[in-house]
């Protein structure tokens, strides 16, 4: 080829081969169990006097637990040193809830904000709350809703006044649309160890615009968009603590009312081209319970024309070949799996198991004792199940996988890390699992995710157009 060097030709072939491999990875039948053993910190909590917990200068400076909530904005220093977190505040993403904690004095639940740095055109007031847990006192927790925001716009905001004032910024997501590109990060079972810090530092290099947490933010029970996990339950009657999920409910607001949910434990949001559903394994979900009825209606309301990517978050995996917590998600699978297949859910993320694992597209909805079909079977309409419970918890990694590796398991490894899902358009997204490896983010499991709805929808549309064309010709004869 004139004007093209041999090196360029080789590079093109390499890229093409790589794409063909990634594009066909869903069809591979041989699962992989990685034997990799990387460096890791001891699974112990970071001491409270560590610099990541240092209070910023200034009297009564706002602060918050540095394990933030969905979505992630700004830069690493913002996350690790200022402890203010935000979460989506409504159904479509043009509202945010800003949360922080003050100690000593309650201060004011007020946020000044605008689209120019240090020029705050608007003021929003929120509410302050606090709670106790045995001998622990939470401090003063502030939640302020900023709504009617412009899409795809950078906002600057200020919390506090005088010496205690702190200034930050966030970026609102693009307007909802079928071909809006967007990059999500996924982290589960983060905890507050040195491995947790390593995961966050690696994650900050990923370029993700928002982070989806899969539960177990803290392990203080021995003390998220955000999903609740078993370590948030905190039901301890021997300490006269009988309100489950107390800390979670006080600290991490969710926009559950916007999706007509009766509980902050399960809810849905739309962001860019994705419709994200968050479920609770630790709330009732069987037939006729509030969560069951809500999910049934929410799935019917999903608009795949505008949000083609349907993503479900939960804490306990429905499919896992790890010895730890084996089959714990079976009850929820038995109740909801058929719905997920019928509605062509693209991917389901879970945590709980402190390792990484990805499945093929499989389902077990044909299970019948009399038929002998006891095991999951390939199902093109089923979601891919991904366990990302390797954020850095204090309990260590779950390295005992079951053997032989089940046919439904595509890749599994017991290492700390995080994932990213980069939506490109209505039909394709790129997925990466990144292992924490010697100070670098290392992609180790990657594939192209094909949208479940649009390929069949396009075929049906072409068929309808063809039939109408044929009918038109017949009518004209």
Describe each PLM feature range.
Residues 2, 17-42, 67-73:
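N-terminal signal peptide
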Residues 35, 41, 45-50, 57, ...:
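Intrinsically disordered, low-complexity cytosolic loops and termini enriched
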Residues 3-6, 27, 156, 463:
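Generic N-terminal leader/processing signal
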Residues 31-36, 48, 67, 75-398, ...:
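Metal-dependent phosphoester/phosphodiester hydrolase catalytic core
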Residues 1-16:
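Classical eukaryotic N-terminal signal peptides for Sec-dependent ER targeting/secretion
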């Amino acid at each position: 080829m004139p004007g093209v060097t041999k090196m360029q030709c080789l590079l093109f072939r390499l890229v093409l081969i790589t794409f063909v491999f990634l594009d066909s990875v869903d069809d591979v039948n041989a699962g992989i169990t990685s034997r990799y053993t990387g460096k890791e910190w001891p699974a112990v909590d970071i001491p409270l006097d560590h610099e990541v917990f240092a209070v910023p200068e200034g009297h009564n400076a706002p602060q918050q637990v540095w394990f933030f909530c969905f979505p992630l904005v700004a830069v690493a220093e913002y996350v690790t040193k200022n402890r203010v977190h935000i979460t989506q505040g409504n159904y479509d993403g043009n509202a945010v809830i800003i949360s922080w904690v003050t100690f000593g004095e309650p201060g004011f639940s007020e946020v000044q904000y605008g689209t120019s740095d240090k020029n705050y055109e608007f003021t929003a007031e929120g509410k302050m709350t606090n709670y106790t847990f045995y001998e622990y006192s939470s401090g003063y927790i502030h939640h302020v809703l900023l709504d009617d925001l412009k899409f795809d716009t950078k906002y600057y905001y200020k919390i506090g006044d005088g010496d205690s004032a702190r200034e930050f910024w966030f970026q609102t997501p693009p307007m909802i649309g079928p071909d809006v590109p967007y990059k999500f990060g996924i982290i589960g079972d983060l905890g507050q160890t040195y491995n947790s810090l390593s995961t966050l530092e690696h994650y900050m290099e990923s370029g993700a615009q928002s982070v989806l947490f899969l539960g177990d933010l803290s392990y203080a029970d021995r003390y998220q968009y955000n999903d609740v996990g078993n370590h948030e339950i905190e039901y301890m009657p021997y300490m006269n603590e009988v309100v489950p999920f107390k800390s979670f409910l006080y600290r991490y607001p969710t926009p559950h009312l916007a999706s007509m949910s009766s509980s902050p434990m399960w809810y849905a949001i739309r962001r860019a081209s994705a419709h994200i559903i968050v479920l609770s394994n630790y709330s009732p979900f069987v037939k006729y319970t509030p969560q069951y009825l809500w999910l049934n209606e929410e799935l019917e309301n999903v608009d795949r024309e505008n949000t083609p990517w349907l993503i479900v978050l939960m804490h306990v995996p429905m499919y896992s070949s790890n010895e730890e917590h084996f089959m714990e998600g079976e009850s929820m699978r038995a109740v909801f799996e058929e719905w997920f297949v019928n509605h062509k859910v693209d991917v389901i993320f879970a945590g709980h198991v402190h390792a990484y694992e990805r499945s093929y597209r499989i389902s077990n909805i044909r299970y019948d004792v009399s038929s002998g079909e006891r095991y999951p079977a390939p199902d093109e309409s089923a979601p891919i199940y991904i366990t990302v419970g390797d954020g850095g918890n204090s309990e260590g990694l779950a390295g005992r996988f079951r053997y032989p590796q089940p046919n439904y398991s595509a890749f599994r490894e017991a290492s700390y890390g995080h994932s990213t899902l980069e939506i490109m358009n209505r039909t394709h997204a790129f997925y990466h699992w990144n292992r924490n490896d010697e100070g670098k983010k290392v992609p180790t499991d990657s594939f192209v995710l094909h949208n479940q709805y649009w390929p069949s929808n396009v075929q049906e549309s072409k068929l309808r157009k063809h039939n109408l064309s044929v009918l038109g010709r017949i009518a004209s004869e």
